[in-house]
Amino acid sequence: MDLEIFDDTNSVPAEKIQLVKDVLEFSGKYLELPEDTEMSVTLMNNEQIHEINLKYRGVDKATDVISFAIEEDDPDELPIILPDDVDFEEPKNIGDMMISMDKVKEQAEYLGHSEDRELGFLTVHGFLHLNGYDHMKAEDEKVMFKLQRDILDAYGLKR
C-alpha cells in the first residue's frame, strides 16, 4: 500500500506511527487490495478532529476516527485518455482517515486495554469504512464488526 501518515500533533511517537502503517498494510493484504492502493491518515488531537467533525459532519464534538472515502466513478470527472499502446492503470486512492490520539488514550483507559490495541482498532475501523463497510444497519454492523475482530485477532491485537 502507498500510505501517507501525517502527525498534526507533532508528538506521536515513531512506534505508534509505525503501528498504524503496519496495521494498514496487514489489513490491505487481508482484504486482498491491490499493492498500489493509496490512502492517507492524519493523527490529530481532540480539538482538531472536533473542527473537522463539525465542518464536514455537522457534529459539534470530538470523535475518535473519521473516514472520508473517495467515491469511485464520479460522473463529473473526465476520463484520462491514453494511447492504445500505453498500459497504465491508475492507483486506487481509497480516501483519507483522521484519528484523534487524545481519544485513543481516553478510550484505552476507559476500556482497560492498551493504547496500541485502541489505535489498531480505530485504524482498522476507519480503514473498513474507506473500503465500503458500515454499521448503519444491524446486518451490516455484524459483517463489519466480525471482519474488524478477525483482522485485529490475525494481526495479534486481541482484546
Curated annotation (Swiss-Prot):
Q: Which InterPro entries match?
A: MetalPrtase_cat_dom_sf_prd (IPR023091), YbeY (IPR002036), YbeY_CS (IPR020549)
**Residues the record lists as binding Zn(2+):** 125, 129, 135
The record's gene field reads: ybeY
What Gene Ontology cellular-component terms does the record carry?
A: cytoplasm
**Per the entry, which co-factors are needed?**
Zn(2+)
Task: Give the EC number.
Answer: 3.1.-.-
- A GO term for molecular function: metalloendopeptidase activity
Q: Where in the cell is it found?
A: Cytoplasm
Q: Give the species.
A: Ligilactobacillus salivarius (strain UCC118) (Lactobacillus salivarius)
What are the coiled-coil residue ranges? none
Please give the SUPFAM superfamilies that the UniProt record associates with this protein: Metalloproteases ('zincins'), catalytic domain
Role according to the record: Single strand-specific metallo-endoribonuclease involved in late-stage 70S ribosome quality control and in maturation of the 3' terminus of the 16S rRNA.
**PROSITE patterns from the UniProt entry:** UPF0054
Task: Give the family from UniProt.
Answer: Belongs to the endoribonuclease YbeY family.
Its lineage opens with:
Bacteria, Bacillati, Bacillota, Bacilli, Lactobacillales
- What Gene Ontology terms for biological process does this UniProt record contain? rRNA processing
Protein name per its UniProtKB record:
Endoribonuclease YbeY
Q: Name one Pfam family in it.
A: YbeY
Record text on cofactor binding: Binds 1 zinc ion.
Which HAMAP family did the record assign? Endoribonucl_YbeY (MF_00009)
Q: Which UniProt keywords apply?
A: Cytoplasm, Endonuclease, Hydrolase, Metal-binding, Nuclease, Ribosome biogenesis, rRNA processing, Zinc
